[in-house]
Amino acid sequence: MSDILDKIIAVKREEIAAALKSAPLEELKLQASARDSRDFVGALRGKHAAGHAAVIAEVKKASPSKGVLRERFVPADIARSYAEHGAACLSVLTDEQFFQGSARYLEEARAACNLPVLRKDFIVDPYQVLEARAMGADAILLIAAALDTPLMVDLEAYAHSLGLAVLVEVHNRDELSAALELKTPLVGINNRNLRTFETTIDTTLGMLDAIPDDRIVVTESGILSRADVERMEAAGVHTFLVGEAFMRAENPGAELARMFF
């Protein structure tokens, strides 16, 4: 398979250039300043303190590798279902071209519940960080495979200055070394290789020994069953970002409860 990540990043740069014309920085800053903030990291730690898994439940219509995951896609209903069944936070895809996401989906999901929300997108520029705050996000994703370390550090600092939490995502030990330069406690291990889209949960299990105890490990992608959850919890991983398994279920929140609680 060709390198999907490079294609996505190229599209992101085109989108940013167009967005700067339609929504200038000063306009975005006004929108961002009007947004309230929810404690993303605190919500995860609250679940841990209560002895529960902390689930970041994803609102995702489609993916490049799997196509459309959910035909009847109503973000507000999905968000409410997750909140009612024990999710700690939400993750909402805002990438339009590859994941059929939307900023509007994030706004609708956040308005439907009280959970903190992660903007799930491919962030490569400070403009997108401000854009995330303006659309109501409480956290952003920084993907180590898409960013060099100095830029990742700068994007994190800007995010924190806006009151946004940061989840830094890695897939291998080289990316992990770069990610540990950041201040965020949230280290996501993506079990899916973003350059090939191949997935194995052994990716998370094979990297745990290199992560300091003061970081919160978030296992991402490929968590599809109760057995996968139990395997992670046995290894000391208690924070999960899950989308596909929930999106394919008739009732996403009920599937969350079945897998985790």
Curated annotation (Swiss-Prot):
Gene3D superfamilies: Aldolase class I. It comes from Burkholderia thailandensis (strain ATCC 700388 / DSM 13276 / CCUG 48851 / CIP 106301 / E264). CDD domains: IGPS. It catalyses: 1-(2-carboxyphenylamino)-1-deoxy-D-ribulose 5-phosphate + H(+) = (1S,2R)-1-C-(indol-3-yl)glycerol 3-phosphate + CO2 + H2O. Pathway: Amino-acid biosynthesis; L-tryptophan biosynthesis; L-tryptophan from chorismate: step 4/5. It is an enzyme of class 4 (lyase). The keyword Lyase applies. InterPro entries: Aldolase_TIM, Indole-3-glycerol_P_synth, Indole-3-glycerol_P_synth_dom, Indole-3-GlycerolPSynthase_CS, RibuloseP-bd_barrel. GO terms for biological process: L-tryptophan biosynthetic process. Its EC number is 4.1.1.48. This is Indole-3-glycerol phosphate synthase. One of its GO terms (molecular function) is indole-3-glycerol-phosphate synthase activity. HAMAP family: IGPS_B. Belongs to the TrpC family. The keyword Amino-acid biosynthesis applies.
